A protein has these predicted regions:
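Short glycine-rich anion-binding loops that position phosphate/pyrophosphate groups of nucleotides
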Residues: 18-20, 147-151, 188-190
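Short, charged beta->alpha transition segments
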Residues: 2-3, 53-60, 131, 166-176, ...
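A domain-level signal for caspase-like cysteine endopeptidase catalytic cores
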Residues: 57-165, 185
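Caspase-like cysteine protease fold
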Residues: 38-54, 133, 137, 164-178, ...
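Non-catalytic, solvent-exposed interaction/assembly segments
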Residues: 1-37, 44, 58-63
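A short, glycine/acidic-enriched catalytic loop
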Residues: 32-33, 148-178, 194-199
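Active-site-proximal C-terminal subdomain of hydrolase catalytic domains
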Residues: 178-251
Length: 251
């Protein structure tokens, strides 16, 4: 911490935790003592991320000078018979696409201003084959998924459209094959392991399955997330990426 302070940089803490019940804990909001501010919000800025050494070495990462994003809008409410109509989904997709594309046209904090090209392609409630085909035909470095998800064996389930799901293992295989470097899930429970009785199954969450298959970076939610929170997060996160912030700082 003293070295980071002396260099006027944030202190990065990368947690390697293998107990599935401990991984879920929000370490970022620990307090030095009762009634004090969370350590990640204090004067000395701390940046948290989870990591694991229990993976094969990554192949050389691609070097891109633009954000090439595939935005996927899945099903919001899997138990809803009526659901959201296609027009509403198109309007939501347009809003998200503008947020992401405009994130490149900003002035970085303390900088002279740099334009970062940002191309966003959108899929609305695709089938698994449509999703795979789009990933394979594009040159995407980032995948954004907005929709519903639940913990389940094989890396959880993403609800792509009514009656159609895709598990984390299937998605991991195509993401690694297409060399996607960052996968972001604005979906509930993406970092939550599946439970068998009272026991959490190790390495069973969507985030962990993708990491262990070789996706370099995954951002997923530990709990439920409201629609407005999801929109605000995407906007702030995309702007930070366009400023060339590291992922942990962008979060």
């Amino acid at each position: 911490q003293g070295i980071a302070t002396g260099q006027e940089q944030a202190l990065r803490l990368r947690l390697e935790i293998r107990d599935p019940d401990l991984i879920m804990l929000p370490w970022e909001i620990m307090q030095p003592q009762a009634g004090t501010q969370a350590i990640s919000l204090g004067h000395q800025k701390l940046l948290f991320s989870r990591t694991t050494s229990d993976v094969d070495p990554l192949s050389s990462l691609r070097t891109d000078h633009a954000l090439n994003i595939l935005l996927i809008l899945g099903q919001n409410e899997p138990n809803s018979r009526q659901g959201v109509n296609h027009l509403q989904l198109e309007q939501e997709a347009t809003t998200l696409r503008k947020l992401l594309e405009n994130s490149g046209q900003i002035t970085p904090s303390g900088g002279s201003g740099t334009f970062v090209p940002c191309q966003v392609d959108t899929l609305i409630q695709p089938t698994p084959s449509e999703l795979i085909s789009q990933l394979e035909s594009g040159n995407y470095n980032i995948l954004f998924y907005a929709g519903h998800g639940v913990p389940a064996p094989d890396g959880g389930l993403l609800f792509l459209r009514p009656g159609v799901t895709m598990n984390g293992t299937e998605l991991a295989q195509v993401l690694t094959r297409c060399r996607v470097t960052l996968a972001v899930f604005n979906a509930c429970w993406g970092a939550q392991p599946v439970r068998q009785g009272q026991t959490s199954v190790p390495r069973s969450s969507l985030a962990e399955v993708l990491i262990h298959h070789g996706v370099p970076a995954v951002l997923a939610m530990r709990d439920a997330i409201a629609d407005q929170e999801a929109l605000s997060f995407i906007e702030a996160f995309a702007r930070s990426l366009a400023e060339r912030m590291p992922i942990d700082q962008a979060v």
